[in-house]
């Protein structure tokens, strides 16, 4: 798929501050007169997204094949493919809070360990091959230890898809650890940049502004105008 824009995905386990960094990065780019489309997944108001919300709320029960849920998440992105591709073709910078890697990390973590590599390839073929979703130019991985991330999730405001402080994945620390391990492996890819968001010396999250400066520095090679002196 030929595009002239750039696609930047902000990834990380729940509670890593993705939404905040998408907002700050969008503001930083727009302040430099760049056209930006910011979005995020799941889109809980889409046809597939509503089913994702039901899954996360536990409406489908505790046990289901991860192929089923991977299809839901991929379908949610497919429903939003049009605006993303259009923005890229117009030369815009698309920044998304979660993208394909979230499916790879969270759903692969729910599969049996001996089949995880095969399942990862299956998801990538589904999203990039079957659905034709554009591939990321850059993935920003906001890395946070699962135990700290889980406590941060509990501080979130009430979300539309669940009345609980944690959805069924957020409440499972073993799942979060497995997903974090998969993210760590994915982060070895050349188009990924890992940003450590937790400071073990202070036993707390780094300030959002400090993280945002590191995020912007990681984006600079992708967007030449950011390298110009102001």
Give the label of every model feature segment.
Residues 26, 147-230:
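NTP-dependent small-molecule kinase module
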Residues 3-7:
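Pre-Walker A (Motif I) flank of P-loop NTPase domains
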Residues 101-181:
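A glycine- and Lys/Arg-enriched "phosphate-lid" helix/loop adjacent to the NTP-binding pocket
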Residues 18:
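Conserved lysine of the Walker
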Residues 10:
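Hydrophobic anchor at the beta1->P-loop junction of P-loop NTPases
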Residues 21:
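Hydrophobic positions on the alpha1 helix immediately C-terminal to the Walker A/P-loop
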Residues 32-131:
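ATP-dependent small-molecule kinase phosphotransfer cores
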Residues 13:
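P-loop (Walker A) phosphate-binding loop of NTP-binding proteins
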């Amino acid at each position: 798929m030929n595009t002239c824009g750039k696609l930047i995905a902000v990834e990380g386990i729940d509670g890593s501050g993705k939404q905040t960094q998408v907002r700050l990065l969008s503001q930083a780019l727009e302040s430099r007169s760049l056209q930006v489309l910011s979005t995020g997944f799941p889109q809980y108001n889409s046809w597939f997204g509503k089913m994702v919300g039901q899954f996360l709320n536990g409406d489908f029960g505790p046990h289901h094949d991860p192929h089923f849920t991977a299809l839901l998440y991929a379908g949610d992105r497919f429903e939003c493919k049009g605006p993303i591709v259009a923005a890229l073709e117009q030369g815009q910078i698309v920044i998304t809070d979660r993208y394909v890697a979230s499916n790879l990390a969270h759903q692969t973590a729910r599969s049996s360990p001996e089949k995880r590599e095969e399942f990862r390839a299956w998801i990538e073929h589904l999203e990039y091959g079957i659905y034709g979703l554009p591939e990321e130019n850059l993935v920003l991985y906001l890395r946070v230890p699962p135990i700290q991330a889980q406590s941060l999730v509990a501080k979130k405001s009430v979300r539309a898809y669940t009345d609980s402080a944690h959805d069924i994945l957020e409440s499972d620390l073993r799942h979060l650890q497995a997903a974090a391990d998969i993210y760590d492996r994915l982060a070895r890819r050349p188009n990924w940049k890992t940003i450590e968001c937790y400071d073990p010396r202070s036993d707390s999250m780094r300030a959002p502004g400090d993280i945002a400066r590191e995020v912007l520095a990681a984006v600079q090679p992708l967007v030449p105008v950011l390298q110009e002196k102001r």
